[in-house]
């Protein structure tokens, strides 16, 4: 009952059969706004479990994908510093829903901008401020989008060239006579 006392929190479990969850840290349970230092980690969460929300707010169900999060919160005398590391692996949108509350955002296009060449979305979202008025910076998200766009633009011509030369594993070198550009009939 002492508001200055601190408690250690350590919860290990699973969401479903294959998705580990860890919640660990220290807090003042009767005055968390004075001091909290806690981490929430979720791994391998199957994204289709969020279909009731994605269908309602994004206008699409989720066909597949996995969610991994590492969320860290520090509160010291009402001052918040938080770091959200989020990885979404192989997100694929499914069928459109008939939601009246969906955001009119191009979610499929936005997803394609956020994905890297391996189909992974990595986001780091810092939040800082007082717990009465937290703010977050979108700069890291914008830079991630720009990096992914540039990577796709740089590799696109090479992917097209690679598609032209399918079966190149059977290609062989052709020897020319010195100073000649004529092909040998056997080539």
Q: What is the predicted function of each stretch?
A:
Residues 136-187:
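Periplasmic peptidoglycan-binding/tethering modules of Gram-negative envelope proteins
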Residues 121-124, 130-137:
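Extended catalytic-interface subdomain
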Residues 1-126, 143, 164-173:
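Small-residue helix/turn framework positions
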